[in-house]
Amino acid sequence: MALNLRKNHPLLKIINDSLIDLPTPSNISAWWNFGSLLGICLITQIVTGLLLAMHYTADTSLAFASVAHVCRNVQFGWLIRNLHANGASFFFICIYLHIGRGFYYGSYLNKETWNIGVLLLLALMATAFVGYVLPWGQMSFWGATVITNLFSAIPYIGQTLVEWLWGGFSVDNPTLTRFFAFHFLLPFVIAGLTLVHLTFLHETGSNNPLGIPSDCDKIPFHPYYSIKDLLGFALMLIPFISLALFSPNLLGDPENFTPANPLATPPHIKPEWYFLFAYAILRSIPNKLGGVLALAASVLVLFLIPLLHVSKQRSMTFRPLSQILFWTLVADLLILTWVGSQPVEHPFIIIGQLASFAYFTIILILFPIVSALENKMLKL
């Protein structure tokens, strides 16, 4: 009998084992669709980004004009740019929902997969930040100035580090050039990390909504989940393309339509919406180093989540107290996002401080306490 090429060819075998014959739990819900959606986001961003890079000039005197040129003179340049700009927003929507799913269902107990995932989030945040600087508008320039300046809070080496990062004494041409280099490189680092993420995931197999072993009831990925993923793609691409075509500037800052001017500071410097929660935490501490540490901790706390798991159950499906805490945390993050977009004045300052305090308290203190309480109530 002839060998099945799909199962025996050195390259096709890898694809087969991860996308076709992969044994998958039979009960994973739509919350498990976001991994493949993130893959689609990454591919979209790399393709549109490559097309934009062909027309972009990484020079302070030409960057803004080159972006305008793409939108005016390049065939479908406006569409490519709008897809790339809004693709970043959808990338973050998907990754936040994906992390939320992992948190709710206890997927973080696959520690290697989770830790690589957190590294992926950090790489994505770095990519988005350096990318936002490239159009060289007002918010690009001042955003870069404010965020890179945070490194100067590091004791002893801070100032030297910032000047080394800038390539001078302020954000200028060398900064823009290196940021373009980083923005081009990092997505490929993300693609590499994604393969590592999947490699670790396929060592253990997917978790499921019940948080129990599912080896006794696995089904092949194709056709069941391949068709489900296609539905997910359609449901994401429809709002994504609608946003890019009907209101492409909805999520952007109008300040970025003004070319960068080091002599005029915008009245309200704020990052894109997906960084606002962290920005609110940064601003809520009236001390530079303290704010920087809180900012770093707001994302790095994700590394601690597997260590803080004290429940005897993996998933939150049958833990109503933890569920209440989880949705309180979600609401808290939405409050932080809103506060981050507001000016630094009363009552936003105190709201931001309370929300920041609540964020760390819920994750580091309340979740372990409530989990232990649930164990006791269930006599586990």
Swiss-Prot record:
Protein residues bound to heme b b566: 98, 197
TM ranges: 34-54, 78-99, 114-134, 179-199, 227-247, 289-309, 321-341, 348-368
GO MF annotation list: metal ion binding; ubiquinol-cytochrome-c reductase activity
Entry's cofactor comment: Binds 2 heme b groups non-covalently.
Subcellular location: Mitochondrion inner membrane
Domain of life, source organism: Eukaryota
Chain positions recorded as heme b b562 binding sites: 84, 183
Disulfide bridge partners, by residue number: none
Topological category with respect to the lipid bilayer: Multi-pass membrane protein
Main localization category: mitochondrion
SUPFAM superfamilies (UniProt xref): a domain/subunit of cytochrome bc1 complex (Ubiquinol-cytochrome c reductase), Transmembrane di-heme cytochromes
Annotated InterPro entries: Cyt_b/b6_C, Cyt_b/b6_C_sf, Cyt_b/b6_N, Cytb/b6-like_sf, Cytochrome_b, Cytochrome_b_C_euk/bac, Cytochrome_b_N_euk/bac, Di-haem_cyt_TM
Cofactor(s) required, per the database record: heme b
GO cellular component: mitochondrial inner membrane; respiratory chain complex III
Any one biological process term the GO annotation gives: mitochondrial electron transport, ubiquinol to cytochrome c
Keywords: Electron transport, Heme, Iron, Membrane, Metal-binding, Mitochondrion, Mitochondrion inner membrane, Respiratory chain, Transmembrane, Transmembrane helix, Transport, Ubiquinone
One Pfam family named in its UniProt record: Cytochrom_B_C
Positions annotated to bind a ubiquinone: 202
Miscellaneous: Heme 1 (or BL or b562) is low-potential and absorbs at about 562 nm, and heme 2 (or BH or b566) is high-potential and absorbs at about 566 nm.
Record function comment: Component of the ubiquinol-cytochrome c reductase complex (complex III or cytochrome b-c1 complex) that is part of the mitochondrial respiratory chain. The b-c1 complex mediates electron transfer from ubiquinol to cytochrome c. Contributes to the generation of a proton gradient across the mitochondrial membrane that is then used for ATP synthesis.
PANTHER family on file: CYTOCHROME B
Homology family: Belongs to the cytochrome b family.
Complex formation: The cytochrome bc1 complex contains 11 subunits: 3 respiratory subunits (MT-CYB, CYC1 and UQCRFS1), 2 core proteins (UQCRC1 and UQCRC2) and 6 low-molecular weight proteins (UQCRH/QCR6, UQCRB/QCR7, UQCRQ/QCR8, UQCR10/QCR9, UQCR11/QCR10 and a cleavage product of UQCRFS1). This cytochrome bc1 complex then forms a dimer.
Protein name (database record): Cytochrome b
Organism: Cyanocitta stelleri
Gene transcribed to yield this protein: MT-CYB
